[in-house]
């Protein structure tokens, strides 16, 4: 493996590292990043990792994630590490942790759940019932959702 950078360093922003291989697009989706926001986003998929074997990396220039955004990432990438970058240096580094409650970010996979009824203005709500690996339950129908279900 070459030691050269695949993607250049960012001056200020957030680097999301140790994303399980193939999950970077799901991370962008839960963060609501479509590419139309104007921020420069770099996405690297399936790079070698000592920790995971293979991993994805997302770099977001000029944006520091909020604590809510950081923790929502754990629903799709529980091994992710967040690096806050200022002046090309890592000023904070931490792991994601699953939130106790998720509201309005995901759809319940149960097609008969009240949250999926077109005329019912019910916000999907999920409660964390297990941290490792993350397991959530729908507050309305009781369906359990594992990693990857909430995308």
Swiss-Prot record:
Its cofactor is Zn(2+). The keyword Metal-binding applies. Keywords: Metal-binding, Pyrimidine biosynthesis, Zinc. GO terms for cellular component: aspartate carbamoyltransferase complex. Zn(2+) binds at residues 108, 113, 138, 141. GO terms for molecular function: metal ion binding. GO terms for biological process: 'de novo' pyrimidine nucleobase biosynthetic process; pyrimidine nucleotide biosynthetic process. It holds the Pfam family PyrI. Binds 1 zinc ion per subunit. Contains catalytic and regulatory chains. Involved in allosteric regulation of aspartate carbamoyltransferase. HAMAP family: Asp_carb_tr_reg (MF_00002). Belongs to the PyrI family. This is Aspartate carbamoyltransferase regulatory chain. It comes from Pyrobaculum arsenaticum (strain DSM 13514 / JCM 11321 / PZ6).
């Amino acid at each position: 493996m070459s030691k050269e950078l695949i993607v250049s360093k960012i001056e200020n922003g957030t680097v999301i590292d140790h994303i399980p291989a193939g999950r970077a697009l799901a991370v962008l989706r839960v963060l609501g990043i479509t590419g139309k926001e104007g921020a420069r986003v770099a996405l690297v998929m399936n790079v070698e990792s000592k920790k995971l074997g293979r991993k994805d990396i997302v770099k977001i220039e000029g944006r520091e994630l909020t604590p809510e955004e950081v923790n929502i990432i754990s629903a799709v990438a529980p091994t992710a590490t967040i690096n806050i970058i200022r002046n090309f240096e890592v000023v904070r580094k931490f792991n994601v942790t699953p939130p106790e409650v998720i509201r309005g970010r995901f759809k319940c996979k149960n097609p008969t759940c009240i949250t999926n009824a077109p005329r019912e203005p019910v916000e999907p709500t999920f409660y964390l019932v297990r941290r490792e690996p993350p397991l959530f339950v729908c507050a309305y129908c009781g369906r359990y959702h594992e990693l990857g279900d909430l995308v």
